[in-house]
Amino acid sequence: MKRLLASSLLILLSGCSLMQPPIESAETIQGTTTVDAVEGDKSESNSGLTDALRNRTDPVAGDPAWAPIHPKGKPEHYAAETGSLFNLASSSSMYDDSKPRGVGDIITVTLNESTKAAKSADADLNKKNDASMDPLAVGGKDLTIGDYNFSYALKNDNKFSGSAAANQSNSMSGSITVEVIEVLANGNLVIRGEKWLTLNTGDEYIRLSGTIRPDDIDFDNTIASNRISNARIQYSGTGTNQDMQEPGFLARFFNVSL
C-alpha cells in the first residue's frame, strides 16, 4: 500500500512540472524591439526631463531601423582546371551597365522636391425680413384699445461677410546615397538610407525610403526623387537650433486652451 501511494505521488509531481509554462530567456526579450520605417526606434526609453517637457525625442545615428543590409558572402566554388584562361564566374558582358540589381547595391537619389498649395474662400450672406399690418377698422373707424390700434411693422436685416486664404510652399534640393534593402518579385527595388551632418550646435539628418524601378535609374547610377514610389523623405535636426524653432510646453498649453 505504501509503495502504491509513493508511486502515485511521484507521478503527480512529475505531471505538475510538465504543465509549467516555458521560461523566456532574457536574450529573446531584449532582442525584440519595435521600429518604424522612417522615425526609427519607437521603444520607450528614459530620455530625461528635457524630452518630457518638449514632448519630442530626437532620433540618433545608428538606428537599427536604418542600418545598412549587406549581402552574405557566397561560398567559393572550386571548379576543375580546364586549362582555359576564360572564367565564366568573373565574366561580364560588354553591353552590361552598372545599375544596382541586388541587396546592398548603392544608388544616389537626387532630391528635387517642390510643392505649392493655395486656397481661398469668400462668403457673403444677406437676409432681410419685412412684416407689417395695417390697423383694424370696424365701421370705418380704427379699432383701438387705449392708444394701441393693433398695427405693427417689423424689419430685420442680417448680413455676413467672410474670407479666408491659405498659401504653402516647400522645396528641397540636394542628394543622398542609399542602399537596396530588398528586391521585389517584379524586379522593383526597395531602397533606404540616411545621412547625418554634425554641426557646432547639433546634428542635421536626411532619411529616405521608398520603391524604385530599375528602368528609371540613369546611366550615372542616379534617380530623381519624384521617381520614387511610396517615398518618405525626412529632413530635420537635433540640438539647440531645432529646439528654438519649436514653442515651449507652456505656449502649447495656452494655445490649446484658447
Curated annotation (Swiss-Prot):
Signal peptide residues on this chain, from the entry's feature table: 1-15
Compartments in which it is found: Cell outer membrane; Bacterial flagellum basal body
Taxonomic superkingdom: Bacteria
Keyword set, alphabetical order: Bacterial flagellum, Cell outer membrane, Lipoprotein, Membrane, Palmitate, Signal
Primary site of residence: membrane
GO biological process, one term: bacterial-type flagellum-dependent cell motility
Lipid group attachment sites (N-palmitoyl cysteine): 16
Residue ranges, annotated region (Disordered): 34-64
Topology of the protein relative to the lipid bilayer: Lipid-anchor
PROSITE patterns given in the database record: PROKAR_LIPOPROTEIN (PS51257)
Lipid linkage positions (S-diacylglycerol cysteine): 16
Pfam families documented for this protein: FlgH
A GO CC term attached to the entry: cell outer membrane
Coiled coil ranges: none
A GO term for molecular function: cytoskeletal motor activity
Record text on subunit structure and interactions: The basal body constitutes a major portion of the flagellar organelle and consists of four rings (L,P,S, and M) mounted on a central rod.
Family per similarity comment: Belongs to the FlgH family.
Stated role: Assembles around the rod to form the L-ring and probably protects the motor/basal body from shearing forces during rotation.
Protein name, per record: Flagellar L-ring protein
Organism: Vibrio cholerae serotype O1 (strain ATCC 39315 / El Tor Inaba N16961)
